[in-house]
Amino acid sequence: MTTARFRQSLLALTIAWLGIVAFATHLLIRAEIGRHERDFEAATQQLSNGLKHKLDTNEAVLAGFVAFLRAVEGNDVESATRYAASATAAYPHIYMLEVARRVSVSEERQFEAALRQNWLADFTLKSFPGITGSPATPAEAKMETWPVLFLYPALPEAQAIYGVRLETVDYLAYSLALAKKNARPVVSPVFELYEGGRAYILLQEVERATAAKGLAATSLFGNTMTALLVIRSDALLPGPAAPAALKTMAYAAQMRSAGRSDNLLFSHEAEPSGRLDTWLLPRFQHEFVIDNVSQPTVLSFEQQLAWHDLLTAEFLIIIGLLACAFVTVPALSLRHFRAVERGARELE
């Protein structure tokens, strides 16, 4: 075999080996990217399932509270407090349970006087703009009003809410109207709490089967009420037990209410990505639609894979072995070629 033939064989072997190593490296990178994509999908599925469980829990707790209000005595605040405490103890994302009752405008003064005598000495019916200092909007004349009469827990910073007419709360007026004669809960837009933070309310009208007479007409719990479940939006965020992958991704949850379709519940921004990450590595995206009856929510996720995520210790070890093989095999082939070439010259 001539020297030229030997060199051609060596070149072909080197190119073939380069192709094999490149293909193996490609498969390794694809496998590692696939593993990260599976971790991404598992983490997003876990967060979606956790949020769905909380939304379903909200409906179940509100349904139980509505059933309780249909049976509670007119002024039995102690029983209502005990029930609210037991119903919300296992669900820290539920911020507050509230009750508002319907009062005829013609009976407002009698109602206020009765509650001052039997409940709160300084009780008064008030408008929401009056306690927040926000501009009041002109209201149409109505035959009824819906003051808030029960809060649990009765937080000191929320005491001003007692007696607030729900229909004067701008973000609740439309939801309150939808809840009337509605067998299903209605969700409000996301809003800023009076005591700070963002929240939304799940509300449902409560109708008693028996009519109230005499003193019952001026009791805390009347014939027609609205049960309200207040949920802080930041409490819906994943807790400490959430997958570590969630810390490196961007995600957002938007709830679709009757009043608005872009209620942002919560969001999380990922750290800025490097240019090499953006150019050379994939960006994972996924969207979940939680078809809750009263709280339909869209969850969107996004994660840019970074080189520091990809270059794990195991990955670097395998890449190192491939690099050694890439250098060693051509070197041994060249050494063998030179030995054969030297032997051929000696034979000549």
For each predicted feature, which ranges?
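Extreme N-terminal signal-anchor transmembrane helix of membrane signaling/transducer proteins, especially
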Residues: 2-34, 317-331
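Membrane-interface helix-start motif
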Residues: 3, 238-241, 300-320
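Intrinsically disordered, low-complexity regulatory regions flanking sensor or DNA-binding modules
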Residues: 7, 118-120, 313-314
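Short, compositionally biased low-complexity segments
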Residues: 15-20, 34-38, 53-59, 139-157
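Membrane-proximal amphipathic alpha-helices
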Residues: 29-62, 69-77
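Cytosolic signal-transmission helices at domain junctions
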Residues: 33-42, 334-348
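Intrinsically disordered, low-complexity polar/acidic regions
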Residues: 41-45, 70-298
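Extended mid-to-C-terminal alpha-helical interaction segments
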Residues: 256-258, 309-315, 320-342
